[in-house]
Each structure stands twice: as C-alpha cells, then as structure tokens.
Curated annotation (Swiss-Prot):
<dbReference type="InterPro" id="IPR012521">
    <property type="entry name" value="Antimicrobial_frog_2"/>
</dbReference>
<comment type="similarity">
    <text>Belongs to the frog skin active peptide (FSAP) family. Brevinin subfamily.</text>
</comment>
<dbReference type="Pfam" id="PF08023">
    <property type="entry name" value="Antimicrobial_2"/>
</dbReference>
<keyword id="KW-1015">Disulfide bond</keyword>
<keyword id="KW-0929">Antimicrobial</keyword>
<keyword id="KW-0878">Amphibian defense peptide</keyword>
<keyword id="KW-0964">Secreted</keyword>
<comment type="function">
    <text>Antimicrobial peptide.</text>
</comment>
<dbReference type="GO" id="GO:0042742">
    <property type="term" value="P:defense response to bacterium"/>
</dbReference>
<feature type="disulfide bond">
    <location>
        <begin position="27"/>
        <end position="33"/>
    </location>
</feature>
<keyword id="KW-0044">Antibiotic</keyword>
<dbReference type="GO" id="GO:0005576">
    <property type="term" value="C:extracellular region"/>
</dbReference>
<protein>
    <recommendedName>
        <fullName>Brevinin-2CDYb</fullName>
    </recommendedName>
</protein>
C-alpha cells in the first residue's frame, strides 16, 4: 500500500545520498576534486 511506496522512496533517496557522500569522500581522499 501507500506505506510500502513511501518506504521504497525513502530507501531510494537514502541510497542516492549515501552514494553522493561516498563519491565526495573518494574525491577528497584521492585529491582529484
């Protein structure tokens, strides 16, 4: 139902945010920003 849709959206957003943070960390560590 609606709850499962909301949960799916939150999980997708969380993955995107985590991915962005990981990319920024890799960038800073490698010094290639």
């Amino acid at each position: 139902g609606l709850f499962s849709v909301v949960t799916g959206v939150l999980k997708a957003v969380g993955k995107n945010v985590a991915g962005s943070l990981l990319e920024q960390l890799k960038c800073k560590i490698s010094g290639g920003c």
